[in-house]
Amino acid sequence: MARYFRRRKFCRFTAEGVTEIDYKDIATLKNYITESGKIVPSRITGTNAKYQRQLARAIKRARYLSLLPYTDLHQ
């Protein structure tokens, strides 16, 4: 049987030494939402709980200010 080796998940924000996730940083936030607009869970991305909470808060603020869409385009 072949064994599959998964890449170890790590928190990018901890590695880079980020103190606060900013809602205006749309390029970073887009990496953590799906095509349909859902927030990707930390078990998929490997983000720490502290940064996952900040990430969710930043995404919700960006959505409220219409910097990010709530859903996809519904075509």
Swiss-Prot record:
Transmembrane ranges, per UniProt, are: none
Provide the alphabetized UniProt keywords.
Ribonucleoprotein, Ribosomal protein, RNA-binding, rRNA-binding
Pfam family name, one: Ribosomal_S18
For this protein, the record's InterPro entries field holds:
Ribosomal_bS18, Ribosomal_bS18_CS, Ribosomal_bS18_sf
Do the record's keywords include RNA-binding? yes
Coiled-coil features, chain-numbered ranges: none
Cellular component per GO? cytosolic small ribosomal subunit
GO MF? small ribosomal subunit rRNA binding; structural constituent of ribosome
Tell me the subunit arrangement: Part of the 30S ribosomal subunit. Forms a tight heterodimer with protein bS6.
Q: Which family does it belong to?
A: Belongs to the bacterial ribosomal protein bS18 family.
- List the protein's name: Small ribosomal subunit protein bS18
Q: Which organism is it from?
A: Shewanella loihica (strain ATCC BAA-1088 / PV-4)
Query: Which lineage is the organism of this entry classified under, starting from the top rank?
Result: Bacteria, Pseudomonadati, Pseudomonadota, Gammaproteobacteria, Alteromonadales
Gene name as annotated:
rpsR
